[in-house]
Amino acid sequence: MPIGPARMPLMDHLGELRRRLTIVVVSVLAATVFMYFAAPTLVDILKDPINGSLQPGEQLSVMTSLGGFSIKFNIAIKVALAMCTPMIIWQILAFFLPALRPNERRWVVPTVLVATMLFFAGVVFCYMFIAPAAFDWLLGETRSIGVAMPKLEDFINTELLLMIGFGVSFELPLIVFYLAVFHIVPYASFRAAWRYVYVVMLVVSASITPDASPVTLIFMYAVMLSLYEVSLMITRFVVVARDGKAGLTESRLGLFGDDEDDDE
């Protein structure tokens, strides 16, 4: 859909916001209905990470009469939101596009593509590596004190939240990149404040891991640290190539000092 660069009055902005919110809501609702009927297949896919951890005689159980509907609806709404992520990101960026400078608008489409790829990379990484290790550890802890009777609803909910958490955490490089490249937060500030950043990432990792197990916490923290350092390396290369070393300390908003030295 076309996006005009012209400035609009307040009421036109509100009308544009309502139109884009309507597109998002209708799209998510339609995707939810479709995913609800595809839920049995999705359940089989989501059960794979735990199947290898189940011992003979153990099986995932549904304890209530409403459990089947609850599981299918839970899967449908969360998968629909994940599948609509590219469209949601596009609608957000398209709404703010008229406020951007011409040389900044060319970043919009690449941003949508990269953000989408990073999100789904995080989801796939969690599904293939994190979820199997986490549930293997959790079931082992359960068996050490009693008989394991894993509930399908709890497992599915935890797995979906884990995958969404890792998908969001994989957006970290994009956030750091744009903050530094557009000189909102200088690269030098990111590098100088690494101790505080590491502590914040540890707190965030503990907050967004729904199972509270040390396995997922350690994996999440390691992933966020790795992504942060890689994003800083890429950002430094781009900023120096475009603006020279002076760009490493430049701040457009003036919120951070320009006298910080690049310690690399």
What are these regions (language model features)?
Residues 1-264:
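Membrane topogenic/interface segments and analogous intrinsically disordered interaction regions
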